[in-house]
Amino acid sequence: MQRRIFGIETEFGVTCTFHGQRRLSPDEVARYLFRRVVSWGRSSNVFLRNGSRLYLDVGSHPEYATAECDDLAQLVSHDKAGERILEDLLVDAERRLADEGIGGDIFLFKNNTDSAGNSYGCHENYLVARAGEFSRIADVLLPFLVTRQLICGAGKVLQTPRGAVYCLSQRAEHIWEGVSSATTRSRPIINTRDEPHADAERYRRLHVIVGDSNMSEVTTLLKVGSANLVLEMIEQGVQFRDFSLDNPIRAIREISHDLTGRRTVKLAGGKEASALDIQREYYERAVEHVAKRSPDPMAERVLELWGRTLDAIAAQDLSKIDREIDWAIKHRLLERYQAKHDMDLSNPRIAQLDLAYHDIRRGRGVFDLLQRKGQVERVTDDGEIEAAKDTPPQTTRAKLRGDFIAAAQAAGRDFTVDWVHLKLNDQAQRTVLCKDPFRAVDERVERLIASL
């Protein structure tokens, strides 16, 4: 694949219960979770030695933003490392609660909706060239993003006035605009706020906020890998059939409610097309595009998975993908549970199981139990994930940030960092500006570290 910088930001749902009853407010739980972070970082917004950012977002949601990655498998490992880092905080917070005589179980969920109907996100970031026509990228990408829940939705049991229904996407019900500069108030599909975290004359950061949080490593690979291929094609001038949607927001909900992928949505020109039709167009262009290049095992893996997922949905044979694609894995899980206990989808125990799928605590979370039983496929392994908790990607700017943080902490020096700045808080206030996210070696940073 053409080299690109990408990253994933994940907000986690949080609650604390004691014998099944809510014990603490989300604000209080978040404070306990981040107490260890604040004790060494003097803030609930910190960068870690693996290059990532960990912070408390609006509404008491812990958020983890991966370091800059330029490889899909690397990104999957760093996304999963975020779960492990937060799990460590969870264990520490439960210990503090017990020490204070409060007691209770803390739950962190990698999902997108809570029982009160609030939504929180999983945002993808893709670096694109400033020179490109951003409006064209958004126009061509929008139908792809609206329909890609078919291939990478997390699945959700939605309670409606007509009863419970199983949907492809958790996030679809909470998106209110196609393209916008806001993220929380209006929840668009693509966020246009121009914060490149890089040289603004050369780069722009495409901020996609429509995606579901994925438990499956394979689904994350397909989500980012397919979007990356579509971006690459747009940048290289590949022409697509015009699938501009008449009403993207209505379409995203209608598609989420149809597991067959065959329900048609209205296009801007008056015609209609199904989610399968639209996804198939992007997939077939991608197959042609990749065939013209030198062999690329990762792109070929993404294409094989993408094509097989579309074929499985078209044939309504989910057994072809129910070890890899989140919504299909969860669908299989819930169907088996329903059959075993003779209950319908509206039973509260189904809602509990739906939620437990996203519990990141190993040994308790349902997805983790499926993984331990060998019932889901993987991209990475536990060793790679463990390494990613402390080691930044070695081929991007994240290495400079991570190395600086590790060295400054070891030397006991006070420092401040963000995505582009590395600063020693001494009399000289020495600061290095790192504007190139592709650059993993920088003599200025080496000198700054040597001066510690």
From Swiss-Prot:
Keywords: ATP-binding, Ligase, Magnesium, Metal-binding, Nucleotide-binding, Ubl conjugation pathway. Transmembrane segments: none annotated. GO terms for molecular function: ATP binding; ligase activity, forming carbon-nitrogen bonds; magnesium ion binding; ubiquitin-like protein transferase activity. GO terms for biological process: modification-dependent protein catabolic process; proteasomal protein catabolic process; protein pupylation. InterPro entries: Pup_ligase, Pup_ligase/deamidase. The active site is at D57 (proton acceptor). Coiled coil: none annotated. It holds the Pfam family Pup_ligase. Its EC number is 6.3.1.19. The keyword Chaperone does not apply. It catalyses: ATP + [prokaryotic ubiquitin-like protein]-L-glutamate + [protein]-L-lysine = ADP + phosphate + N(6)-([prokaryotic ubiquitin-like protein]-gamma-L-glutamyl)-[protein]-L-lysine. Mg(2+) binds at E9, Y55, E63. It comes from the Bacteria. Pathway: Protein degradation; proteasomal Pup-dependent pathway; Protein modification; protein pupylation. ATP binds at R53, T66, W419. The keyword Ligase applies. NCBIfam families: pupylate_PafA. Catalyzes the covalent attachment of the prokaryotic ubiquitin-like protein modifier Pup to the proteasomal substrate proteins, thereby targeting them for proteasomal degradation. This tagging system is termed pupylation. The ligation reaction involves the side-chain carboxylate of the C-terminal glutamate of Pup and the side-chain amino group of a substrate lysine. The reaction mechanism probably proceeds via the activation of Pup by phosphorylation of its C-terminal glutamate, which is then subject to nucleophilic attack by the substrate lysine, resulting in an isopeptide bond and the release of phosphate as a good leaving group. Belongs to the Pup ligase/Pup deamidase family. Pup-conjugating enzyme subfamily. This is Pup--protein ligase. The lineage of its organism: Bacteria, Bacillati, Actinomycetota, Actinomycetes, Pseudonocardiales.
